[in-house]
């Protein structure tokens, strides 16, 4: 049986630093402005990529990682604005679904957020979601829930924008800037994926201050969840 390769993608250095520190036998590779570390964790081959912020960066990085390393699955890690009821800074959302909240081709009969010829919502792999839920049982310091994560090329920081997004995605738990692009790329390339995000802010008028203050805490919680999940895959 071949060795399992797990790719983990984060947008910011703060979101992947802990993961890289836990890896063994690390080698660094680059592709244009993108970098990835290949190493080992928990008896598995691990590829850790820094995508940069935004959906285009995330899609390019994901396509490169899949082409270069042929991973068995992709995990997206990082921070997010918490939109789910009761979510607090530091809480973790297992993204079992991902969608674009800023795509509008409704004039041609598509659903809001739907890219033509693709699903309106991208479903995460149930085995990966299950491993994340198992990891949640031993995760300490924050609550964990599963649900929809929506992405757009904007940092959401107003209650008005939050209300608009919620009106289109009533079941949304979190909002950020990369997950849907990673999910779409994985779907198109036939690679199982899951999203793990920790809440750094509430996506309201204080989001910029909260994000700067709590990013490190959110990044650590998301990374710890990924590590516990990898131990169970």
Where are these regions (language model features)?
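Structural motif
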Residues: 72-73
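A glycine- and small-aliphatic-rich helix-loop capping segment at beta-alpha/alpha-beta transitions
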Residues: 21-27, 67-68, 88-99, 216
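Mid-sequence, gly/pro-rich, charge-dense loop/helix-turn segments that line enzyme active sites
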Residues: 83-169
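His/Asp/Glu-rich mid-to-C-terminal helical/loop segments that flank catalytic regions of hydrolases
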Residues: 203-233
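N-terminal short beta-loop-beta anion/metal-coordinating cradle
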Residues: 2-69
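Alpha-helix C-terminal capping segments
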Residues: 64-68, 86-87, 183-192
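A C-terminal functional module that forms or caps the active site or interfaces directly
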Residues: 154-202
């Amino acid at each position: 049986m071949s060795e399992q390769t797990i790719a983990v993608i984060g947008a910011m250095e703060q979101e992947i630093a802990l993961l890289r520190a836990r890896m063994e036998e690390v080698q660094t590779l680059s592709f244009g402005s993108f970098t990835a570390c290949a190493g080992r964790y928990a008896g598995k081959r691990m590829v850790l990529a820094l995508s940069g912020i935004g959906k285009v960066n995330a899609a390019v990085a994901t396509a490169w990682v899949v082409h270069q390393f042929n991973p068995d699955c992709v995990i997206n890690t990082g921070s997010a604005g918490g939109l789910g009821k009761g979510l607090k800074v530091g809480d973790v959302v297992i993204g079992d679904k991902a969608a674009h909240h800023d795509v509008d081709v409704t004039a041609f009969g598509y659903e809001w957020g739907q890219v033509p010829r693709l699903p309106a919502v991208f479903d995460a792999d149930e085995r990966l979601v299950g491993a994340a839920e198992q990891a949640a049982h031993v995760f300490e310091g924050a609550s964990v829930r599963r649900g929809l994560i929506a992405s757009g090329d904007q940092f959401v920081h107003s209650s008005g924008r939050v209300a608009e997004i919620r009106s289109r995605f009533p079941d949304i738990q979190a909002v950020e800037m990369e997950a849907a692009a990673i999910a779409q790329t994985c779907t198109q390339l036939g690679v199982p994926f899951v999203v793990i995000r920790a809440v750094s802010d509430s996506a309201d008028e204080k989001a910029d201050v909260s994000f700067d203050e709590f990013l490190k805490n959110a990044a650590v919680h998301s990374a710890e969840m990924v590590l516990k999940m990898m131990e169970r895959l």
